[in-house]
């Protein structure tokens, strides 16, 4: 791993060839740092002419749907105290977050109760050292916010003998204890370059979901500079029938877990992966993931099942691989029929890179 990290950290581009597949066809080799030879991808960098459809799709539309604080008052939080007060209110609220809210080196964890929308104002909403804890709650939207735990120095020594942030399970956003109907959209989450900061446990997940949490959609977010991105299911004993959709997210400079997914069913489509050098989509413990129309670039084991007592499965189609290595399946090991319509938001595989890099993250709504 160390050698792989050092190689990646130097951004080596020496014409290492790998296969490229679209629509189940294995194409000719493509070279690292160059455009793939597959013809349609030549259009992938053209700027999309129109704003995409940003409406909610995926598992968060099920189980009664996800509306957040709709119907409640709209309030503005400019301080940590205001955000804490509004987030723990029993009333439905749309909480506008204006500017940077910082918890300093000590850090803070905000408990978010049901029927809330946390909405960043313009491109200014920034939670620095402030984690969001969604525990046993329902109907929550987190949108247009930037989050990091990288400023927190409040740590403890974990069971592996490594330092770990001592609040919010080390996560930027924790969804746990049976929380349902959560939509995280157009956010940016990051910590530190994993090459420069080698302790993989210091910050845990950017967004983790565990303990029977389900009906979650994570869309149009920018995740970067982090080791372990998404833990969906905390262990091989966390056997809930979880249901999570990931679409139109941009993953850059990530080690692994994009996501790691145990049990249940999931949907991973139209995401762009760039410089993911541990594992990509890692299906474990019998999970069946529909993985379609994603663009994988410079990614190790883009779709795989690893480090699991029981292998996971995938329903894979129309994914594109360039400058990748390891497992790049073009056939499926399970079949997943989804309970929702999403054709209105689907992007052609060849256009995913351009669309996602332009429209994912904060300030794009």
Model-derived regions: residue spans:
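Short strand-loop junctions, especially beta-strand C-caps/beta-turns
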Residues: 80, 100, 233-235
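Repetitive beta-strand solenoid architecture
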Residues: 71, 91, 97, 106, ...
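Extracellular "leader-to-stem" segments immediately downstream of a signal peptide or signal-anchor
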Residues: 2-94, 104, 325-365
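Extracellular beta-strand/beta-solenoid scaffold signature
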Residues: 128-132, 156-175, 197-210, 225-238, ...
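Right-handed parallel beta-helix
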Residues: 115-121, 138-151, 179-195, 203, ...
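Extracellular beta-strand-rich solenoid/capping regions of secreted or surface-exposed proteins
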Residues: 84-92, 101-119, 125-144, 149-179
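Extracellular beta-strand solenoid repeats
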Residues: 76, 96, 111, 119, ...
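Extracellular beta-rich repeat passengers
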Residues: 260-365
């Amino acid at each position: 791993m160390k050698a792989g990290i050092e190689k990646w950290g130097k951004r080596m581009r020496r014409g290492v060839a790998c296969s490229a597949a679209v629509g189940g066809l294995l194409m000719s080799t493509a070279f690292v740092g160059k455009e793939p030879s597959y013809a349609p991808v030549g259009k992938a960098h053209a700027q999309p002419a129109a704003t995409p459809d940003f409406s909610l799709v995926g598992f968060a539309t099920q189980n009664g749907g996800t509306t957040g604080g709709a119907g409640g008052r709209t309030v503005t939080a400019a301080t940590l105290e205001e955000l804490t007060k509004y987030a723990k209110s029993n009333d439905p609220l749309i909480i506008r977050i204006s500017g940077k809210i910082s918890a300093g080196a000590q850090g803070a964890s905000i408990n978010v109760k049901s029927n809330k929308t946390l909405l960043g104002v313009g491109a200014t909403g920034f939670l620095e050292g402030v984690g969001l804890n969604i525990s046993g709650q329902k109907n929550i939207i987190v949108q247009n916010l930037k989050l990091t735990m990288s400023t927190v120095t409040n740590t403890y020594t974990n069971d592996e003998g490594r330092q770990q942030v001592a609040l919010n399970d080390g996560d930027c956003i924790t969804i746990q204890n049976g929380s349902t109907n959560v939509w995280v959209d157009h956010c940016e989450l990051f910590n530190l370059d994993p090459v420069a900061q080698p302790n993989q446990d210091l910050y845990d997940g950017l967004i983790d979901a565990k303990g029977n949490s389900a009906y979650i959609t994570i869309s149009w977010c920018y995740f970067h500079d982090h080791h372990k991105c998404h833990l969906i299911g905390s262990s091989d004993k966390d056997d809930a029938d979880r249901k999570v959709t990931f679409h139109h997210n941009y993953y850059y400079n990530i080690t692994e877990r994009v996501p790691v997914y145990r049990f249940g069913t999931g949907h991973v489509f139209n995401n762009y992966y760039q410089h993911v050098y541990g594992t990509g989509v890692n299906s474990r413990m019998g999970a069946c993931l529909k993985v379609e129309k994603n663009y994988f670039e410079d990614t190790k084991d883009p779709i795989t099942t690893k480090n699991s007592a029981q292998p996971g499965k995938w329903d894979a189609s129309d994914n594109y691989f360039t400058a990748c290595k390891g497992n790049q399946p073009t056939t499926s090991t399970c079949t997943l029929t989804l309970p929702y319509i999403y054709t209105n938001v689907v992007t052609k595989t060849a256009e995913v890179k351009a669309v996602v890099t332009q429209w994912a993250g904060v300030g794009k709504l």
